[in-house]
Amino acid sequence: MRTRITLALAVLLLLLAGCSPGAPADGPVTLRFQSLAWQPDSVAATKELVGEWNATHPDVKVEYIQGSWDSVHDQLLTSFEGGEAPDVIHDASDDLADFAYGGYLADLSGLLPARLASDIPRGSWETATFGRGVYGVPFLQEPRVLIADADRLRAAKVRIPTPGHPWSWPEFRQVAKKLTGPGRYGVAWPLKEPVSATLNLSLSAGGRLFHRGADDKVTVRFEAGDEVVARTIHDQVAVDREHAPASTLGSGGADTLPGLFGGRYAMVPLGFSYRQQIVRQAPEDFHWQVLPAPAGAGGLTQGVSPQTLSVSADCPHKKEAVAFIDFLLRPRNMVRLALGDWMLPTGTQALKDPALHTARHGWATGTALAARLRPAPAQSVRGYPEWKDKVATPAYQRYYSGASTLADVRHAWSGTATWCWPATSADPPPGVPRAGKRNIRDATSRLPSTP
């Protein structure tokens, strides 16, 4: 009897030991980290950091998995539904809503270290906040800037804008006119994705487009501030026809680079990270510079959708996953990731790094814009992807090509007042399938107050 009791106690102790938190029975914890880094410097920096983590954390190993921006949404959805999602997920804030509402992402608000939570500004946290939860850590972002042919600017004797004294939108139009000549355009607008580019730049002119009422419902109203950027693009292409070509309206940013290098275009509005491609591809005799985008009533304000790091709701080691994210986003490491991707870090300490304040390759110009970056206007609007594809993109494409008028755009918007909507208070919170959007302030109020 005594032998059987002793054996039973031994078995019980073994079972209890196996259930003890932080003491995995099968050896070190393994976290699967899917990265979307794609530029050579960015991939190298990310893999180096994973290697450094593994060398100093023998009990928590990280497995690097290469993902792709081209297919990340569908790939993640498939992996979530199949129970094969990575533990740590690299994505962008404008792609998180469906996953947060579907219960696929972990709420990080109770897991974030105080250092990390306080280092990233509240506005950046809002991009990854849904209801009462924080479903991603925003860490890299990029403003839209003007990449300009420095020799053309000098020859035209135009005023060179700075973050402290940018061009206004009317002045930008006049400069484009001065830079125009036979077979040469003042500016090229690559607008393969016209909606996000227009909405984000329109914040500089006081545009909002999406208006949330006291009942938390969203309506679409195309007002004076929303007209400025749209009218500028339209007029440069369809009215001042020689100032901007219609042929680039359906192009991606990279498609315009040969024309910029060859002197066909004097300026191209591009994301800040395109500088890496320019450094790698531009002829040696091509002289270029980075200029801030034009400013209006809202100053240099722009909308952005930062890159994010999230944790799968099914991850059995969430604390370890957040610890790894915290390691990746230590100030110096965040700088390494930003330099590798040619983007700006969200962290206030990382933004102070001297490497981001050099005039070389326009780093200082971009860093000066960081304080003016705000959540993209559509971040908190449910139904936005469908509205963008079915309503907004065709409307902007017709208007920019000269096939319709601003009144037509306004009329198209007027029929979509109820297309985009947040959840009602009766909806379950994010984390539960078919959940809805609630007041974003609920979660951010629990984060430390930051700039």
Curated annotation (Swiss-Prot):
SUPFAM superfamilies: Periplasmic binding protein-like II. Pfam families: SBP_bac_1. GO terms for cellular component: plasma membrane. A lipid is attached at residue 19 (N-palmitoyl cysteine). Its main location: membrane. May participate in oleandomycin glycosylation and secretion during antibiotic production. This is Uncharacterized lipoprotein in oleD 5'region. It comes from Streptomyces antibioticus. The lineage of its organism: Bacteria, Bacillati, Actinomycetota, Actinomycetes, Kitasatosporales.
